[in-house]
């Protein structure tokens, strides 16, 4: 439910900017919306669309937590936590997560797309290495969380691919 509402946040922002939606693709890391005119959005508007999913999760998480507190709905805290965790995870600057795209857009708006690509790719590698280190530490300490190691490795591979593409673009 949290992932579906996250994508609804992106969808609502795209609709607000009158961008037609072509489709929705499910992947191992969640869902990806395909929109026809998103390339024509300004950096600022694309940043709004990128952060709208996390914004939706944050609003839903806070509202669910408030509702759970005031109406003694203990299970609601699980839903609130899922929204907040999904929001925080998606804000990590690791491709293909929203945080990486947001960082790329912000830096690109200031310094151009080549610098934006390079900064986002480097941040992605560094953050995914930190995530992998934390996952390995967790596994060594608790003998649990092996799936987190695999997820961190997948994110590291994605970040390394982006770094390779950014380096190639700078050389051209």
Protein language model regions, located:
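Hydrophobic transmembrane alpha-helices and their immediate loop junctions
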Residues: 1-172
């Amino acid at each position: 439910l949290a992932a579906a509402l996250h994508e609804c946040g992106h969808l609502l922002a795209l609709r607000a900017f009158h961008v037609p939606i072509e489709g929705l693709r499910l992947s191992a890391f969640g869902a990806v919306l395909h929109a026809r005119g998103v390339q024509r959005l300004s950096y600022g508007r694309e940043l709004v669309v990128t952060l709208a999913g996390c914004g939706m999760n944050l609003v839903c998480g806070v509202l669910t937590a408030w509702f759970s507190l005031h109406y003694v709905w203990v299970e609601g805290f699980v839903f609130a936590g899922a929204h907040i965790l999904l929001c925080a995870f998606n804000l990590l600057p690791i491709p293909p997560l929203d945080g990486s795209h947001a960082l790329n857009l912000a830096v690109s708006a200031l310094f151009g797309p080549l610098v934006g690509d390079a900064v986002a790719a480097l941040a992605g590698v560094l953050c995914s290495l930190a995530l992998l280190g934390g996952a390995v530490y967790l596994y060594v300490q608790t003998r649990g969380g092996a799936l987190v190691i695999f997820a961190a490795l997948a994110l590291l591979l994605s970040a390394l691919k982006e770094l390779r593409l950014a380096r190639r673009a700078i050389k051209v």
